[in-house]
Amino acid sequence: MGTEWDGEADVVVVGASVAGFCTAVNAAELGASTILLESADEVGGTGRKAAAWAWIPGNHLMQEKGIPDSREDAMAYLARFARPAMYDPEHPTLGLPAWEHELLEAFVDNGPAAMKTLVDIGALSVMHADDYPNYYSHHAIDKVPFGRVVIPQLPDGEPGDGIEFTRRMEAAARERGVDIRTSHPVEGVLTNEAGEVVGVTAADDRRFRARRGVVFCTGGFSHNDGLRDQYLSGLLVPGCSVPTNQGVLVDVSRRLGAPLIHMNAAFMSPIQYEWVLRGDPEIVGLFQTPGDSMIIVNKHGRRIGNEKTSYNDRSIPHLTFDVERAEYGNLLSFALWDERTNTTWAGAPYGFVPAADGDRSLVVEGATLEALADALDARLESLGSRNRGIRLEPGFLTGLAEQIARFNAMAIAGVDEDFRRGDAAIDRFFHGERIDNPYPNPTMHPMSGSGPYYASIIAPSAIETKGGPRATPGGGILGPDDEPIPGLYGVGNCVASATGQAYLSGGITFGPYITFGLLAARAVVAAPVKEVRATELA
């Protein structure tokens, strides 16, 4: 009896978001029949919700403008911040593990061509975000602080976002005959007697044959509570990625004996904690911190860090372990602002200040600081066991008053002596336009001495995890013998990241997805056909 398949193609791509679309479109462009399976009922994944900025050193728009960006400068920037404790500029791999260095080299060497390919084949229209700084542009090692970001362009010439990226890439895929099937969650892979991957299984006993290979582009495991607790110690809540990011490739890798790497790392962002508790799939992270007359404090009323730095680095202070108290005392912290910020920054995107007519259920209000503290502690109490053991300390109000007095003095002077808020270009970029602030530092304005005051509960979240099996530059997933498993590939957050602990810039996810999507497509299209018999799949 012959094998019955629900679909058969040269290439099966799993996951119809950024990495998946880039892989599928390139594979089809190279002449391969391609099936694209998506677990949700619509395509786009987390990429649909994103700004869709792609960070690509030496991109073609930089070249057209004559902006120099050497391979050496790009590699130094990547290596220095990905692995700060290991970085060695004199070492052949800059101090990085060889496989990470190889991946970063492949990204730098192929990124410009990968982006230009999508443009040349008509899959995307893009424009240059040449005013967008790298997140560590204030460090001397960053020789090219601006110009590496490329963004989608709408038909009217305006900047696009993840919705536009998804629209264009879906159209490009369909134009090339890619068979897109939504509501097809993949559960595992099929192998032949030689151990080669020859297809996948999906829900409802559906099976799909991949003659040359299967490419997983399924995202990380940020919404898998068990995996997140196991590998991230329960510290990070699920972020703004789509709920279908359940770590399916983790399970596949375990079954095939593929080692898992960097499972304790994540791309992070602060997030409004009570929004997380609602399980709203439309949730977004706090990618910007609105306001100048605002601070973020812990349960002692003390600031925890620079409120204006990048979202990943704003998450790090939340994870500080208090040795004396043996606790993560900043795990829930509190954005606190006055009426100036509440009015002037109302409805600012990616922030916590609601629009004047917006939903205020995530905001606690008080006519005085005393009233605000009482209301905030009552809100924490109402969360019960979900408050992560955090209540306001008895000295919160005293600490807060002292903190506001110190912040106000620094705002008048224009220098944040504690956390250098406003010093870096990225602080000022995320702050946005200077709004009616007469003080020297545009990111700081004294908080009002009278109410009302407002607060929101903030937690650190995993935008997406960075761990998984190791992959070659061509996406081949390495098995227990450190050799690629024939027929199995991975691109994106489902495989181990080479960027270590860092979030180097906006677009550091899209840029590599676009690059490695092309490289994986080339590799799988060139791979030999894997033979399979019905008896081997029984």
Report each predicted region and the residues it spans.
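Extreme N-terminal leader/targeting segments of oxidoreductases
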Residues: 1-11, 29, 499, 503, ...
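Core beta-strand elements of the Rossmann-like FAD/NAD(P) dinucleotide-binding domain
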Residues: 6-9, 203-213, 484
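N-terminal Rossmann-like FAD-binding beta1-loop-alpha1 element of flavoenzymes
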Residues: 11-36
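Glycine-rich FAD pyrophosphate-binding loop
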Residues: 29-50
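Conserved redox-cofactor binding core of oxidoreductases
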Residues: 96-205, 225-226, 273-274, 404-447
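A glycine-rich dinucleotide-binding beta-alpha-beta segment and adjacent secondary-structure elements
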Residues: 188, 389-498, 502
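Glycine-rich loop(s) and the adjacent beta-strand/alpha-helix scaffold that form part
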Residues: 208-277, 283, 510, 516-519
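An anion/pyrophosphate-binding glycine-rich loop and adjacent beta-alpha core
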Residues: 250-252, 259-395
